[in-house]
UniProtKB/Swiss-Prot annotation:
Keyword Cell division: no
Compartments where located: Cytoplasm
GO molecular function: ATP binding; ATP hydrolysis activity; peptidase activity; proteasome-activating activity
Main localization of the protein described in the UniProt heading: cytoplasm
Cross-referenced SMART domains: AAA, ClpB_D2-small
Family the UniProt entry places it in: Belongs to the ClpX chaperone family. HslU subfamily.
Annotated organism of origin: Shewanella baltica (strain OS185)
Keywords carried by this UniProt record: ATP-binding, Chaperone, Cytoplasm, Nucleotide-binding, Stress response
Gene Ontology terms: cellular component: HslUV protease complex
Protein name: ATP-dependent protease ATPase subunit HslU
Single GO BP term: proteolysis involved in protein catabolic process
């Protein structure tokens, strides 16, 4: 897992997300606390439970982006899910326990990559021997089986050429394991164990024998390394480590949690809102979930929930779930200055993306300071007058602004454009000032 300090985590998030320091600090501390907990004695460690987070803020201010960037920094099993995708147990739709099953699958993949990385050197040696065997087949007759000095020397010559890349383009016939055909079975509620057993049965039935293929040595070497590394990984140890990783370091990001709040007085079962909240309770509090890899305890999994709460309030969540999300963080609405920073400061910012895209056609595009100010102001004004969709408004405004250049770029190779205040005014003023037009076009 990540050993980064909270300050380092915030610094990494700053490279991609403008503002929202409170939210960044909260997730940074939560991530660091995962590491701190693992430094404690085993007995005391069990008593330290994660403090789950609820992020509240309007749409388009960076809630989901924080989750995306955090996933890359965490170096731990991480899953982002939309709360609206789930229904109460017993009804058609996904059950919330599927979150933990998917998280376990992610952990299996992560652990497999780590273990295969550790035994990569041995896998390369085995792959090298298999390629040399294909290049220099061993004699089939028993009386010729003793390796002579000349054949040994020839093998060493070919080994040297192989390592230097001189044989990369040479084609060989080699036996390569066939990919397994997966069978997806939709399981009825409460019958996941039977479904897993059926899937295992089909998986074993569908194992095809190795197929002889003709390919270049460079391609064959990559395939054989993967194949040999997979053979060296102990599957039982892999499952144990993955489950341990989920239980101790797993992070679940629940997006759009405000959409499962109960709205007004409704009669009948609310299976996709309050029902989902009730099902989430044991998951967030701590329970045991059955997966095809084994039993997974959720007691120490960190849950980060987020929602815009425009049509509802955090207090509309059922009280038990509110209590299980003790840390509340409010994200601020974006100002015109924030828009300006979003256009220029982050790594691979929106302006940099358009400059790079047009450069592929031989067209040089430059954004002046006044142009960036005007774009930011236009996006902010449209947000204020119509629906506030946050930074996503910049994508709409920029696409409309660059529409003519993008369309004609292939015919204007070698030309240059400067996007200044006058250019922005000429292309956007009518749309921004006309509220009806901006509602439909921007």
């Amino acid at each position: 897992m990540s050993e980064m300090t909270p300050r380092e985590i915030v610094h990494e998030l700053d490279a991609h997300i403008i503002g929202q320091q409170k939210a960044k600090r909260s997730v940074a501390v939560a991530l660091r606390n995962r590491w701190r907990r693992m430094q404690l004695d085993a007995d005391f460690r069990q008593e330290v439970t994660p403090k789950n987070i609820l992020m509240i803020g309007p749409t388009g201010v960076g809630k989901t982006e924080i989750a995306r960037r955090l996933a890359k920094l965490a170096n731990a099993p991480f899953i982002k899910v939309e709360a609206t995708k789930f229904t109460e147990v017993g009804y058609v739709g996904k059950e919330v326990e599927q979150i933990i099953r998917d998280l376990t699958d992610i952990a299996i993949k992560l652990t497999r990559e780590q273990q295969m990385g550790k035994c990569r050197q041995r896998a390369e040696e085995h792959a090298e021997e298999r390629i040399l065997d294909a290049l220099l087949p061993k004699p089939k007759n028993d009386w010729e089986s003793t390796e002579t000095d000349s054949s040994s020397n020839t093998r060493q010559v070919f080994r040297k050429k192989l390592r230097e890349g001189q044989l990369d383009d040479k084609e060989i016939d080699i036996d390569v394991a066939q990919p397994q055909i997966g069978v997806e079975i939709m399981s009825p509620p409460g019958m996941e164990e039977m479904t897993n057993q059926l899937q295992s049965l089909f998986k074993n039935m569908g194992q095809a024998p190795a197929k002889r293929r003709k390919m270049k040595i460079k391609e064959a070497f990559k395939l054989l390394i993967e194949e040999e590394a997979a053979k060296l990984v102990n599957q039982e140890d892999l499952k144990e480590q993955a489950i341990e990783m989920v239980e101790q370091h797993g992070i679940v990001f629940l997006d759009e949690i405000d959409k499962i709040c109960k709205r007004g007085e409704t009669s009948g079962p609310d299976v996709s809102r309050e029902g989902v909240q009730r099902d989430l309770l044991p998951l967030v509090e701590g329970c045991t979930v059955t997966t095809k890899h084994g039993m997974v305890k959720t007691d120490h999994i960190l849950f980060i929930a987020s929602g815009a709460f425009q049509m509802s309030k955090p207090s509309d969540l059922i009280p038990e779930l509110q209590g299980r999300l003790p840390i509340r963080v409010e994200l601020d609405a974006l100002s015109a200055d924030d828009f300006k920073r979003i256009l220029t400061e982050p790594h691979a910012s929106l302006t940099e993306q358009y400059i790079a895209l047009m450069n592929t056609e031989g067209v040089k595009v430059e954004f002046s300071e006044s142009g960036i100010d005007s774009i930011a102001k236009a996006a902010w004004q449209v947000n204020e007058r119509t629906e506030n969709i946050g930074a996503r408004r910049l994508h709409t405004v920029m696409e409309k602004l660059m529409e003519d250049i993008s369309y004609e770029a292939s015919e204007k190779s070698g030309s240059a454009f400067v996007i200044d205040a006058d250019y922005v005014s000429a292309h956007l003023d009518n749309l921004v000032q006309d509220e009806d037009l901006s509602r439909f076009i921007l």
